[in-house]
């Protein structure tokens, strides 16, 4: 259950909603299996599979959104439509028009949908109501938006905003690379991507390559030519490694093995392990995120 990605958002501090009310409002949109005639279904599931839609430990919460989709390849639909269109042409003496083809495609899709396989995925979210963190374990903003959209559908009020810092991640990464050093508490690792802003989007990638003195001049030359960093691998406090993206996304989030071993030692059963993992993960992230924001010049607080 250790998160591997973070899409970062902010809630008011504190967010004044109690656990019982939050759980009650989530129950407006529980997950149900995808009906045979529908392409998709989504809803809340128990993160711990104990029936509760909100898992709570201390003042930290976790929720989970499941999405089930029916897999109906367009190539299968197209082939069936083509065969039926040819049969229609033979029967009526002329090729079906645009309207007929549209209706035919809709009918074929409706007929084939119940026979399509389904695929299910679950996205987890960590909420810290006291400190205003809303973090989605998703590799793309689109998957985070699925969660946010369903929350807006269920909650009476959901005052979520993007996280904005005084210095953009891209500008900060460029500054760190140009200076050859990361801010206090962080170290630069061995992965980096720089891209040009022009139409060709020329890119340079360093993968598992030390970014120290040996190539710092090379990187500075790329920066001077107009390329800007879009990804940079970093480690915080020798405890968390991650890749920071230009749009504030965090990927390849990895916690020091020692932390996981510590959680394993403190748990004897699966439930205890879940609690220990969540407590350690949220404890580390609660320290890490404010320091990352500080490294980016501090948070831009919107005027109320």
From Swiss-Prot:
| Role summary | May be involved in recombination.
In the record, biological process GO terms are:
DNA recombination; regulation of DNA recombination
MF-aspect GO terms: double-stranded DNA binding
Q: Give the record's keywords alphabetically.
A: Cytoplasm, DNA recombination
- Reply yes or no: does the keyword Flavoprotein apply: no
Q: State whether keyword Acyltransferase applies.
A: no
Q: Tell me the PANTHER family matching this sequence.
A: RECOMBINATION-ASSOCIATED PROTEIN RDGC
Q: Might you report a single GO cellular component term? A: cytoplasm
What name appears for this protein in its UniProt entry? Recombination-associated protein RdgC
Subcellular location(s) of the protein: Cytoplasm, Nucleoid
Similarity annotation: Belongs to the RdgC family.
């Amino acid at each position: 259950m250790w998160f591997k990605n973070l899409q970062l958002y902010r809630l008011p501090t504190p967010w004044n909603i109690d656990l019982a009310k939050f759980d009650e409002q989530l129950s407006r949109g529980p997950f149900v299996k995808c009906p045979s005639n529908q392409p998709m279904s989504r809803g809340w599931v128990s993160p711990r599979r104990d029936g509760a839609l909100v898992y709570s430990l201390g003042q930290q919460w976790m929720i989970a959104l499941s999405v089930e989709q029916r897999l109906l390849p367009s190539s299968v639909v197209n082939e069936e439509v083509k065969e039926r269109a040819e049969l229609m042409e033979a029967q009526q003496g002329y090729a079906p028009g645009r309207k007929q083809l549209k209706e035919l495609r809709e009918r074929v899709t409706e007929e084939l949908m119940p026979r399509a396989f389904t695929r299910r995925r679950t996205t987890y979210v960590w909420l810290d109501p006291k400190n205003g963190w809303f973090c989605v374990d998703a590799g793309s903003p689109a998957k985070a938006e699925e969660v946010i959209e369903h929350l807006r559908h269920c909650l009476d009020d959901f005052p979520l905003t993007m996280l904005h810092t005084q210095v953009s991640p891209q500008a900060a990464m460029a500054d760190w690379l140009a200076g050859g050093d990361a801010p206090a508490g962080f170290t630069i690792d061995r992965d980096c991507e720089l891209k040009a802003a022009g139409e060709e989007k020329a890119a340079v990638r360093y993968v598992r390559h030390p970014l120290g003195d040996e190539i710092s001049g090379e990187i500075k030359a790329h920066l001077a030519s107009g390329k800007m960093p879009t990804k940079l691998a970093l480690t915080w406090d020798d405890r968390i490694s991650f890749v920071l993206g230009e749009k504030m996304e965090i990927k390849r989030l990895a916690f020091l093995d020692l932390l996981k071993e510590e959680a394993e030692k403190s748990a004897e059963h699966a439930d205890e392990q879940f609690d220990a993992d969540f407590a350690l993960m949220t404890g580390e992230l609660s320290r890490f995120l404010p320091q990352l924001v500080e490294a980016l010049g501090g948070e831009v607080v919107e005027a109320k």
